[in-house]
């Protein structure tokens, strides 16, 4: 059942962009089809176009060479928070999705809801990870705005087990990225026959551990340097789902094979769109969901890893291909983040945006080549929740509705299914403002407690992308100003966490050019 929302602003907007009469149908067709693609644990360096010495990604390289390459694109430091971020345009702490395994809240209005209201067909394929995908879940893809879905509660490898529209889990045989793309292409073909614009979200299970690959992809990386045999990493066993230690070289061979298979699948999708005559006015947006995990990390120009707010934890590949809207290739160094996807996509689709605090901005000026800097800083906050307080906290969703059904290849708490949780937060306390946090401007990045005991760090990423030179003591006035901005924003996030954004009927706000023409976030 779809959420009850005030749709009058959306209808008004559609009248504005779709003239009445014969021209209306033509104008309606101008709106692009939209496909969001996301790799799982795919870091910024792990693509050919960013100069990786080993990873082969010819199709992502083609997208970067023909479309808009986002060199400073960011995500949350871990998985579920980024997925919630994409769906809502809001920081995940606003609705309690602090870490992997925390569900989204049913009241959240998603980009799928908004585009469905605007006349788009909506489909989800692959990893969900913001709640169970079963029919009874109030946060399954259908409840969060998708008309059709073939999804998994968490992550998967070869021969994945997926649920179609909340039905019993079904095993598919083959490389998981290829399976998702084949299913998505079938979906797109049906929508073309129905003459419906489509919004399709494809969230791959690759290259998340435990790693695996088909033989032809594994053979591509047999020449990796032997020096990686001297390093041992801890990760999940494909056979048992338990933690094991393995040589880094063996792990990288499998990890890179997964990336190449995912890339090849993206190439198959691009070719299918061309065959169907849809490629010109279909926007493809690829990104990773967080940075490189320790189990997949070799030498790097960046500091940190998945789960941290240093560059290797949050900086990810970002590329947009849309021939009709981005006819010439461009490279952008403007800071952008996954929360920008919702306001941007809504503007593209002529859809409304929810009348709640958003953390993303509309990037249409960037797509149009009219945005050279980001006025609104990007804020990060990795708060893991108060484990002690949650023992007595009231669950936000009944626990029986939060149990997963799609089998994992990795044990979570001794179980081979993913169960979710979310809690009511009745009051704001001083101890709620802890955790790693950061604020990124065009000039500086302030990091607080990025690692235990590190305190306050200030970096000039243009001169020091590796975050090695802490400028905090040299610029106390900048530290003070950015710290205040970050703390003030945290207060607003905590208000959201307490449920103060929700009303009985979540209203929508029209996205108009006046709201977004300068690339600034506007107050509601």
Language-model segments: which ranges?
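Formylglycine-dependent sulfatase
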Residues: 12-15, 22-450, 454-457, 465-485, ...
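Carbohydrate-binding/catalytic loop surfaces
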Residues: 508-510
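Bacterial N-terminal signal peptides that target proteins for export
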Residues: 1-10
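Short hydrophobic transmembrane-like helices used for membrane targeting/insertion
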Residues: 7, 17-20
